[in-house]
């Protein structure tokens, strides 16, 4: 109790409400109730080709983000409020939670797709691993001293090494072409694998080894290539990414047009428009601070500005269509100003 000349003055001190009480009041707030209805409407939308689960999650996150931005603008324009700050905090936590769920779902999707691609690639790798040891075993069984003393060992080794190199590279190319034909046609078609003629003195021995090599390759390739005729090639998964979907030309623009036609919200952000109005008033009143403007007056100015801009763009698009164009250009807007806005400097 304080005493002054005019008499005693009583000052009352109130305890701030508890967090639980504030939460109960926030749950019954009209903005929160309207947002809950909007959220349920998004969740109850049926599945279609233009709306998948990932798009629905992104739409929910955007709704949280827009609501938080709206409250932050109110916090900037008006006095600080504990209830509003608590609502911003709660909705921010909810938005982060939905973003975490969305990221986990995306990671799980790509993990499953990689596992599926790996399982499709496994039969091809196993068949290649089976063929490699057979080739190595056949190479180790070749007897390079078959001709005895009449054959030069060094000369035979060099010739055999170059011949084996060209033959192995040719076999690799033919094996790849045969694998491609397996995936397109079930019937095996082999190219002629006749070796190049050799004009050295050991021609008969080389031809014999090449024939044996070709027969072994035919047997190994036929035995390993018959079962996996029904396998799928790697990279041909039917699962596609949802957020990289291709749209037809103009589809996104039409969706945005329908969205803005259904909404009754302002298209210009409130805070920048208020700052612009204050700046214009300050310039016109020679930087004096003796002015006030009501919130409904600002709303009326914003509605008038949006109506004027919409009408101007409608006329400019009509001029653009008259010129047999679909792209709006600055000359269309300038022509509209000359025709319809002569008094506007």
Curated annotation (Swiss-Prot):
Instruction: From the UniProt entry, list the residue stretches annotated as the region Disordered.
Output: 117-246
Subcellular locations according to the entry: Nucleus; Chromosome
Instruction: Name any GO cellular component annotation.
Output: nucleosome
- Name the InterPro entries for this protein: Histone-fold, Histone_H2A/H2B/H3, Histone_H3/CENP-A
**Where does the record place the site Cleavage?**
128-129
Q: Where is this region: H3-like?
A: 263-340
What Pfam family is a match for this entry? Answer: Histone
Among CDD domains, the record links this protein to:
HFD_H3
Please state the span of the N-terminal signal peptide per the UniProt entry: none
- Composition-biased stretches (Basic and acidic residues): 122-149
Stretches of Basic residues bias are at: 233-246
Q: Mind listing the GO molecular function terms for this protein?
A: DNA binding; protein heterodimerization activity; structural constituent of chromatin
In its record, the post-translational modification comment is: Cleaved at the onset of meiotic anaphase I, likely by separase sep-1.
The cross-references to SUPFAM superfamilies, in alphabetical order and at most eight, read:
Histone-fold (SSF47113)
Which keywords does UniProt give here?
Chromosome, DNA-binding, Nucleosome core, Nucleus
Similarity remark: Belongs to the histone H3 family.
Q: What does this protein do?
A: Histone H3-like variant which exclusively replaces conventional H3 in the nucleosome core of centromeric chromatin at the inner plate of the kinetochore. Required for recruitment and assembly of kinetochore proteins, mitotic progression and chromosome segregation. May serve as an epigenetic mark that propagates centromere identity through replication and cell division. Not required for chromosome segregation during meiosis.
Record note on quaternary structure: Forms a nucleosome-like histone octamer containing two molecules each of H2A, H2B, cpar-1 and H4 assembled in one cpar-1-H4 heterotetramer and two H2A-H2B heterodimers.
Name of this chain's protein? Histone H3-like centromeric protein cpar-1
Biological source species: Caenorhabditis briggsae
The lineage is:
Eukaryota, Metazoa, Ecdysozoa, Nematoda, Chromadorea
